[in-house]
Amino acid sequence: MESYYLAGMNEASLPNVIIGGAPKCGTSSLYFWLAAHPEVYGSPKKETFFFADKVNRFNASANVHEHDLDHYEAFFKGGQEATVRFEATAHYLYEKVAREHFSNWPHKPKMIFLFREPSKQMYSHYKMERYRTKRIDMTLSEYIQRPQIMDHVDYAKHLKAWMDAMPEGHVR
């Protein structure tokens, strides 16, 4: 991983906590509860997707593949005085690029991952994709047979990758 931008990093303009986890596991609720605290600053955009493995529809305008860290720092420019600065991109649980970047920061952020009983997570995610976003048109049985769906609930595998990448005590 290239760390050309690390030298000029200002710790107070970057998050010291990152919330991730499987989709539909409570990251939005935790984001809003924490952001309401007067000593905590949540990025104005809950999920920045800045360190996603590839450019996708959620981070097309601001991502590590096309921009330097200044674009990421902009999410936290109002929170320099906050004790805790954070964002909550659930998908970072699965993202190799995020692991590589956060583990190479001089000041490693604390990582908090949220999980849910796998069958309930899969069902909730299915309902969202089928009925709310209308991204899929298949039965629940067909949906859960997709390899990526089963991989997304292999929480131990993804959590271990983060625990191997970050210092002890930084992953919860």
Where do the model's predicted regions map?
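Nucleotide-sugar-dependent glycosyltransferase donor-binding/catalytic pocket residues
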Residues: 23, 94, 151
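PAPS-dependent sulfotransferase catalytic core
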Residues: 1-89, 104-109, 119-125, 129-143, ...
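Canonical radical SAM enzyme core domain
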Residues: 94, 118-119
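Generic structural signal for well-ordered alpha-helices
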Residues: 69-73, 99, 159-160
